[in-house]
């Protein structure tokens, strides 16, 4: 037998190298076969519910890193809730209707207008479902646990029927109406857009300053006076029907030198405008408040048959322009509101493709709206005072990336104004994990207009509205429920397969249809109404879920999207918010903090991360960042996270290896019988348990990451395990001192594995497979540990906190000696301490082998003053000398008792005692040379 074989060198097959890219799919397959998700739900039946409702990603293309961050975050929360005693089923979902899928088919060469509509919609459906399957595999590869066999998909018949019933309840309450209000209109999509489908970019536009001649000054202005207007949308002048001034703004009538005309501008802007127009020696003839100009009549700049009325509006400012704006009720929300209030004509001169129509006049008809500025300038003639190109923030279609316009078209609206206060009151009851999120959603609801819910597209859920022969819309409770039942049985495709009369209840009549003829609406619903109905289609309709949901967790862009639409529909139907809590996340940026873009080549695909590092590293990264704000990710950042993972893994591997001969039932030592240092580590670990339990409950992932990394690297690796080798390797295998330490090792190993499970389920299960004494087959079927408290806990913590300070001072002294070449490793040291009374009391309280704790071979606690040249740190003096004696071949300490024993072993007395008591045969036969 060799001497080194008498050491308890921990042995384990648990590999140092994780091999995550290859192992993770194997684990995932095993979990599927074992039906782990279903077994976890069965374990928690009857326990308090926690429902995280999944916001549906759009089914188009592979997932990106933002998807991964969101789904992993949800998975961590659901897993932690399940292990904390909650019934927390997770139903993943997908949003499957809308323009992007139509655009993909168009790029693939599908010509919608050449196909039968039903055939086209089936192609859309097939494509959407193929994308659902693609993304499902992507999400499962991340280790996300959920009811993947029964997800919700917005195109399924049951979901579409639930959506129709949400609409029906809103219609019953009078919240659905038809109007010709201006809406965001995308000429590139040929459809109206919701606010959530708008994004802003800088756009260079031609701005014009021009004048309208006064026709009837109402005794205030003369007819040789011109009111000066500013616009950044020249095409809208074709539909201008009024001029709007601010009631409380001061306006001046001026006459520049050499001009026969008089002009009206805002007093505050006169100087800047005079410079812009080249006016000199401007004479101010009169000053009027805006309200005094109300109802003055002017003439359209070129269509002299059209009068433009001066009206008052709160939206007019003196921040730019002239303090006067022209008003085209067909091309703007503010224009529409003040125009309708003053009986102005709602006139629209642009068609659905952005082309000027015949009613714009022969000079404009057929031109693209954005190209008419030269024609407008020509038509204005000497009424044009100035023109310039300006760059300003402008709304774009978020899908096509093309600018949009405001355009009044007949649309279906969901009222927000009728129950706005009810929505705002519900926001106050929701718990927001960021106060700014609450303010943002509150302000959006407070300031938003009614919701245009109709879309002039094909792929979506039809609006369940019929029309009588006289054009009267029909949407009664009876007709809507009948449509819902048809959708439930056949899917919404039935709307396009059948005639209107075959979609109505049998025998249905209406006074507006004396001949019994009906037509049906051909518009579909805004896709935000689709996903915004998920609280009904999923949370209400699935028996395992409870409404309202406990948590909605999505990106911060969803304050204007899913959070918003879900809130409106839920309050409209039931008077309550669909969620009790909202947690939002920022965006994933590249390593430099730049937005990720395929064109910039700075995107990171989750699949690439999985191939290089494994999904565990992506999961750990999610906890390493504050995702409530924008976060950074790059392969370099992931390499750093991978290194942290390696440290955690190797530390836990050490614990596995050094508890391989430990049976917790037979070998565990009661807390009361532990050494002081072991009690300290037990208490510190339970503080960690408490911190992590609270952080899981509060969704504070970064707190968990920092706490675990700190405990593993500082408390374990840099302290407890650093000196542990001198005990677990060297002491007799069944000695009390070794079993004391193994008791702590095993407790930490089992519980920290459970704590890590929601974040690193693959690694946790791999560790668990080595813990043969644990009852649960899978760690995912266990519970999170509860934090314990212990007698004299604070006193023990105070003692060891003080010792850690002392240890730090001692390490400085050893480092100094190492630099001076007095010693090499710390085990070569004889450390003499000249303590003050506080330290002397402390070392007595520690009641441990201090030399062992400091990893030195010899320690002397000296009396009296320290010699000259001693190293002093914070009133404690140290002298470091090389230890006396020889190196023990077994424990590697330098000791004066080391000698060659009769059994061919150069060992110290302590090791000799262990050998003679535990290895009698080897002692009698003599040890082999190493």
From Swiss-Prot:
Major localization class: cytoplasm
UniProt binding sites for ATP: 598
InterPro entries: aa-tRNA-synth_I_CS, aa-tRNA-synth_Ia, Anticodon_Ile_BEm, Ile-tRNA-ligase, Ile-tRNA-ligase_type1, Ile-tRNA_ligase, M/V/L/I-tRNA-synth_anticd-bd, Rossmann-like_a/b/a_fold
Keywords carried by this UniProt record: Aminoacyl-tRNA synthetase, ATP-binding, Cytoplasm, Ligase, Metal-binding, Nucleotide-binding, Protein biosynthesis, Zinc
Keyword S-adenosyl-L-methionine: no
PANTHER family reported in the protein's UniProt record: ISOLEUCINE--TRNA LIGASE, MITOCHONDRIAL, SOLEUCYL-TRNA SYNTHETASE
Domain notes: IleRS has two distinct active sites: one for aminoacylation and one for editing. The misactivated valine is translocated from the active site to the editing site, which sterically excludes the correctly activated isoleucine. The single editing site contains two valyl binding pockets, one specific for each substrate (Val-AMP or Val-tRNA(Ile)).
Family under the similarity heading: Belongs to the class-I aminoacyl-tRNA synthetase family. IleS type 1 subfamily.
Identification of the protein by name: Isoleucine--tRNA ligase
Organism: Streptococcus sanguinis (strain SK36)
Gene of this entry: ileS
């Amino acid at each position: 037998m060799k001497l080194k074989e008498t050491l308890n060198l921990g042995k384990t097959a648990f590999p140092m190298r994780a091999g995550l890219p290859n192992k993770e799919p194997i684990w995932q397959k095993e979990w599927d076969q074992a039906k782990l998700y279903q077994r976890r739900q069965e374990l928690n039946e009857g326990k308090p519910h926690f429902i995280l409702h999944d916001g549906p990603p759009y089914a188009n293309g592979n997932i990106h890193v933002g998807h991964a961050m969101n789904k992993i975050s949800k998975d961590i929360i659901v897993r932690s809730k399940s292990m904390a005693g909650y019934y927390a089923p997770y139903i993943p979902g997908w949003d499957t209707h809308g323009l992007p899928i139509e655009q993909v088919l168009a790029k693939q060469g599908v010509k919608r207008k050449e196909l039968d509509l039903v055939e086209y919609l089936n192609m859309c459906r097939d494509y959407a479902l193929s994308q659902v399957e693609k993304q499902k595999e992507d999400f499962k590869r991340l280790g996300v646990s959920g009811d993947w066999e029964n997800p919700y998909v917005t195109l399924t018949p049951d979901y579409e029927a639930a959506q129709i019933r949400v609409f029906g309840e809103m219609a019953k309450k009078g919240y659905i109406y038809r109007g010709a209000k201006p809406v965001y209109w995308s000429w590139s999509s040929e459809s109206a857009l919701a606010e959530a489908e708008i994004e802003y970019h800088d756009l260079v536009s031609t701005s014009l300053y021009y004048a309208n001649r006064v026709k009837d000054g109402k005794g205030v202005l003369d007819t040789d006076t011109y009111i000066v207007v500013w616009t950044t949308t020249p095409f809208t002048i074709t539909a201008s029907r009024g001029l709007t001034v601010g009631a409380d703004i001061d306006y001046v009538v001026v006459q520049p030198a050499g001009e026969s005309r008089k002009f009206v501008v805002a007093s505050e802007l006169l100087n800047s405008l005079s410079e812009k127009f080249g006016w000199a020696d401007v004479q101010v003839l009169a000053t009027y408040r805006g309200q005094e100009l109300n109802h003055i009549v002017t003439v359209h700049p070129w269509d002299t048959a059209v009068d433009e009325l001066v009206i008052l509006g709160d939206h007019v400012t003196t921040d730019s322009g002239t303090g006067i704006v022209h008003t085209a009720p067909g091309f703007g929300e503010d224009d529409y509101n003040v125009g309708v209030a003053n009986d102005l004509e709602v006139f629209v001169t642009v068609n659905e493709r952005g082309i000027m129509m015949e009613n714009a006049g022969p000079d404009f008809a057929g031109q693209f709206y954005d190209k008419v500025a030269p024609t407008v300038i020509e038509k204005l003639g000497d009424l044009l005072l100035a023109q310039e190109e300006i760059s300003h923030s402008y709304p774009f279609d978020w899908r096509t990336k093309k600018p949009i316009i405001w355009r009044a078209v007949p649309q279906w609206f969901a009222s927000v104004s009728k129950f706005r206060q009810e929505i705002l009151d519900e926001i106050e009851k929701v718990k927001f994990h960021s106060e700014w999120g609450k303010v943002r959603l509150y302000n959006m609801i407070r300031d938003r207009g009614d919701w245009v819910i109709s879309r002039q597209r094909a792929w979506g859920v039809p609006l369940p509205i019929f029309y009588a022969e006289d054009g009267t819309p029909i949407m009664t409770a009876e007709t809507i429920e009948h449509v819902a039942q048809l959708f439930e049985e056949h899917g919404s495709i039935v709307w396009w397969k059948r005639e209107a009369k075959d979609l109505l209840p049998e025998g249905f009549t209406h006074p507006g249809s004396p001949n019994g003829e009906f037509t049906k609406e051909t518009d579909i619903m805004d896709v935000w109404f689709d996903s915004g109905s998920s609280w009904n289609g999923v949370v209400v309709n699935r028996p395992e879920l409870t409404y309202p949901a406990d948590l909605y967790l999505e990106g911060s862009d969803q304050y204007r999207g899913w959070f918003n639409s879900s809130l409106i529909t839920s309050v409209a139907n039931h008077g309550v918010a669909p969620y009790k809590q909202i947690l939002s996340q920022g965006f994933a940026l590249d390593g430099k903090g730049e937005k990720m873009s395929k064109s910039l080549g700075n995107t990171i695909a989750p699949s690439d991360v999985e191939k290089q590092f494994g999904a565990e590293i992506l999961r750990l990264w999610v906890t390493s960042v504050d995702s409530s704000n924008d976060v950074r990710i790059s392969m370099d950042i992931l390499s750093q996270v991978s290194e942290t993972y390696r440290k955690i893994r190797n530390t836990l591997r050490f614990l596995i290896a050094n508890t391989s001969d430990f049976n917790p039932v037979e070998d565990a030592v009661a807390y009361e019988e532990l050494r002081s240092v072991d009690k300290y580590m037990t208490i510190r670990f339970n503080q960690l348990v408490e911190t992590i339990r609270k952080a899981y409950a509060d969704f504070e992932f970064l707190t968990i990451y920092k706490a675990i990394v700190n405990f593993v690297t500082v408390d374990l690796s840099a302290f407890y395990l650093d000196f542990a080798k001198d005990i677990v390797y060297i002491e007799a295998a069944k000695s009390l001192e070794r079993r004391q330490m193994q008791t702590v090792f095993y407790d930490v190993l089992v519980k920290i594995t459970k704590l890590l499970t929601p974040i690193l389920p693959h690694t946790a299960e791999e560790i668990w497979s080595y813990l043969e004494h644990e009852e649960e087959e899978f760690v995912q079927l266990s519970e999170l540990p509860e934090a314990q408290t212990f007698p004299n806990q604070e006193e023990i913590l105070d003692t060891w906190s003080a010792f850690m300070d002392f240890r730090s001072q001692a390490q400085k002294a050893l480092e100094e000696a190492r630099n001076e070449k007095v010693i090499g490793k710390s085990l070569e040291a004889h450390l003499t301490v000249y303590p003050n009374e506080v330290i002397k009391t402390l070392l007595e309280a520690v009641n441990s082998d201090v030399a062992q704790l400091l990893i030195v071979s010899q320690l002397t606690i000296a009396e009296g003053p320290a010699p000259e040249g001693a190293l002093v740190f914070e009133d404690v003096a140290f002298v470091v000398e090389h230890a006396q004696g020889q190196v023990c071949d077994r424990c590697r300490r330098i000791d004066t008792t080391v000698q060659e024993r009769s059994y061919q072993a150069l060992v110290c007395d302590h090791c000799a005692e262990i050998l003679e008591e535990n290895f009698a045969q080897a002692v009698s036969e003599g040890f082999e040379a190493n």
